[in-house]
Amino acid sequence: MKTLLWLFSILFKKLILKRAFPILILSVLFSCNFSKKPKGENTIHIPKKSNILWLVTEDMGQYLPSFGDNTVLTPNLSRLANEGIRYPNVFSPSGVCAPSRAAIVTGMYPSSIGANHMRTTSYTEVTGLPKYEAVPPPEVKMFSELLRKQGYYCTNNAKNDYQFKAPVTGWDQNGKKAHWKNRAQGQPFFSIFNFNVTHESGLFEPYERAIAIPEDIEFRIPPYLPDTKTVRRDLWKMYNNIALMDQQIGKVLKELEDDGLLENTIVFFYSDHGGPLPRQKRLVYDSGIKVPMIIRFPNKIYAGTQDDQLISFVDFAPTVLALSGQVPPDYLQGQAFIGEKQIKRDYIHAASDRFDGFTDVIRAVRDSRFKYIRNYQTEQGYYLPVTYRERIPTMKELIKLRGEGSLNEVQSQWFREKKSKEELFDCLNDPHEINNLANQAEYQNKLIELRNEMDRWLTEINDQPNLPERDLINKLWENKLEKPKTTTPVVSITEGEITIECGTKGASIGYRIVNENASPSAPYQVYTVPFKIEKGNHLEIIAHRIGFEASNPIKYISKF
C-alpha cells in the first residue's frame, strides 16, 4: 500500500495538469493487481466441451495497461485480465500475419509447410513466381475441422489469411456474419472474432477514425525511433486504434454475457504478431513477435494471475484441442500449455523470409532471457524498402532523417548496409535488442547453446532457409507445372448407406444434404463415417486437401 501511495504521489505531481492523468491513474490500478500463478498449477480442470471464444487483434505488441504500458485505458481488456490469466511470454513464429496465422490454424511452423513467405497468394508476380499455397503433410488439418468432428460449431469472423484456401470442412460459418448465435441449441462452439482496427494500415494518412484519446497524451518512444512530431502522431494513432479495438471487444463480450454464456466459455485474447511500426512488424525482434495474451476461464479460475511460461503460436492448436477434451494428434509441432498433457517449453522459434517483393532470410531462437539470431543474407541490411510500409509517415520520417544524417547511433542501426552472421541479445536487460553480445567471451556458452538448438529445430522441422522460393514451389507441387488438384470424390451405396472416398491422400471431404427445407448456404459437414439420407434428397460433395485446388463438386440424388 505504501508503494502504491508513493507511486500515486509521484504521478500526481508530474501529471496533475495533463489530460492524460485520469487514464494513467486508472491504468495503474488495472496493472498492479497481478500475482504469479503458483508453479505446478497449470492443470486447470474445466468441463469438457466448454465453449471457446477467440478475440484476435492485429499488429499489436504488449501496449496494454495489463502488460505494463499505461499509455491508454483499455477497460474491457483490463477487466478480462483481472478476471483471467495474463501470459507475457507468447511469441508468433513470424513478424507478419499470414505465416503466423498458418501456424495457428495448423499447429505447424510456417517454414515446415511452405507458409513462410509473405504472401504465397500475392506479390509473387513481383519476383516472377506463380501464386501458390502452403502444402502441409497430408495428415495435417485445420484444427477447427477436428473440433467440428467432435460436435463443435466453429465460426470465423472474418479474416483467414492462412497461406492456403480454407477447405469447406474448416468452418460452419466463415465471414462477416459468422457468429456463435447461429449454432444449434446447446451445441458447444469455437468462435473467432478478428479486429483489424490496430492493423499497420491504420497508421496511414489521411487518418479519419473516431478520436478515443487526447492527442497530447504522453508516449513511450522506443529508442530506435526519433522523438519527432511525425513519430508522435503515429504513436497517437496506434494507441487511439488500441482504444477503439478495446471498445469493439467490449461489444462482443457484452453479447457473450447477455447470452448467459460468459461462465461457460473460455475466452482468449491475443494479437497475431507484434507492433505495426517500422523496426517492429516483419522483424524477429521481440517488437515484431512478442504479443499480449489473456485467457479467462469460467468462474474466473486463477483470476488476476500471471503465467510466465514460454508459448509459441504452434501451441495454440494442441491447447484448444486438449481443452475440448481431445488428444492432440501426434503430427502437431506445438504442445499444449494448459491441461494435464502440458509440456514445459524451453525455447521459441521464429523466421523471416520474403516480404512482398523483398527477401531477407533470418532465423531466431529465444529462451526466457536470451535470443539468438542467424542472418543468412549478411551482405544485405535489415531495412527493406517494402512499398506497403513506406506509406507509414514514421517510415518516411526515418528515411528523411537518415538522408540528413540526423539519426543517432541506435536509430541508425536498422539502416546498416550489412548484418552480422550471428546476433545474441539479452532480452531481459536489453528489451529493444540493441547490443549484440555474440562476440563477447562471457556469453559464448549461451551462444553455443542457442546455436545448437537452432540447428536441432531446423533439422526437426525440415526447414531449408537457403531454398529458393522457386524450388520451394516445385517441392510443394511435386515438380509439376501447376498447383495440384484434389481428385473428384466417389460415392458408393451399400445397403442404403452412403460411403464417400477420395483418391487424394489427406483430402478432407465435405458434404451437405439439400432438400426443400434446407438453406442453400447450409454448411458442409465433415465426412467421417457412412450415413443414410432420405429418398429424393440431394447430396452436394467437395473434397479438398490443404494447399491443393478443391475437387470438382459433385451432386448425388438418393434413390433409396
For each feature predicted by the language model, list its residue ranges.
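Bacterial Sec-dependent N-terminal signal peptides
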Residues: 1-47
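Short, compositionally stereotyped local motifs that mark structural "simplifiers"
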Residues: 4, 14, 438, 445-452, ...
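Formylglycine-dependent sulfatase
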Residues: 32-416, 431-452
